[in-house]
Amino acid sequence: MTREESIAFYKEHARWLFNISLRIVREPALAEEIMQDTILKALRQTHGPEGNRKLPERAWLAKTCIRASIDALRRIKRERLFLDEYASDGAPEYFSPADSDIPEERLSVNKIKAAIESLSDPYRLILNLILIEGLDYEEISSITGEREGTLRTQYSRARKMLAARLMAGQEGL
């Protein structure tokens, strides 16, 4: 693969992979790192012993990016548990949620995003993968290792939680 082909591949997939990862990890720097690692992994596959391998399909790229993002979340969770357990009171707070809620008088995309972001990990993840990425239960099951029935239950609960949060926000207007 030539340098120009590699650059074209990067330009074609970078933003899409970044957005997938950002919706999961909610930290731009980490999402960018995951996106770059995913692209490097894809490009390395084309430079194997045969030298003329095809580039991976979008489904493979999405699956690889999602798995890397979930792994990063697990790593952050372990670090957070460690900090909570062993850090002193004077330690800096590394994991503060971003305050991105913009007050508006009607139900808006920003309010929906904020409501989704306020959900805990399994519910936020399932909503992002189904509603935003357009994946089905079978694809999500192969990515996360969860059973499809579990995913359906999580999705149903996530929708109810999201609706309740949006309704609570509407009543406050």
Each language-model region and where it sits:
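Structural recognition of an alpha-helix C-terminal capping motif at a helix-to-coil junction
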Residues: 19, 33-40, 44, 55-67
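Internal acidic/polar
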Residues: 79-105, 136
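Arg/Lys-rich amphipathic alpha helix in sigma70-family domain 2
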Residues: 62-84, 105, 157
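Residues within helix-turn-helix
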Residues: 29, 138, 149
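DNA-recognition helix of helix-turn-helix
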Residues: 66, 70, 123, 143-168
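A short pre-motif secondary-structure segment
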Residues: 126-130
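Short amphipathic alpha-helical boundary/capping segments
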Residues: 111-120
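A short, charge-rich alpha-helical start-of-domain segment used by transcription regulators
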Residues: 1-19, 29-32, 43
